[in-house]
Amino acid sequence: MEDLSDYARKSRVQLEILSFAGNTVQSILQGKGYGEGEIMQYVMEHSELLKGEAFFVKITGRLQVHNIREITKKLKEQRIYFNIPNRTRKDIYDTRIYAMPIEQFREKFMPVYTQVMDDEGVYLEHVYTRQIVNRGIRVYNFPSYPRIEGISGSRGTIYAYSEWKCKIRDMISRFNYY
């Protein structure tokens, strides 16, 4: 933790480290999306950094978004941002990175993580997508396509990106197509 704290200080970034014991039995029964929902609920209820904020960006823990500063400078704090992971599949939203007003998250997304059932193929992405569709929630693409690198916590998938493909996605994102 000391290395991370040093890095945050040198980067002039506020860092808060939260730790809690989630419901391990329920996470095993329902899957990693359930555990992620528990974590987000804990963060929303206990984070000192979020107390004075109206908006947040969530990035999955093992991933780096190389253009996060560029993205956050362009976000409008009254909007909800998700991308779709694959433009040929518009029936699911990407939960590796999303952003929205905190109250919108608390009201519309935080309560539904309990519907996750990995064994039945119902992942957090499905549950959030269902909320968006059923409630008619207006969602925007990120203003710049996220340059994501890292490793998936569930399947060990390695995420990398190609800059030229991201440039094309940047243009397409302006039309809210991703």
Model-assigned labels for residue ranges:
Residues 1-178:
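ER/Golgi luminal nucleotide-sugar-dependent glycosyltransferases, focusing on the catalytic module
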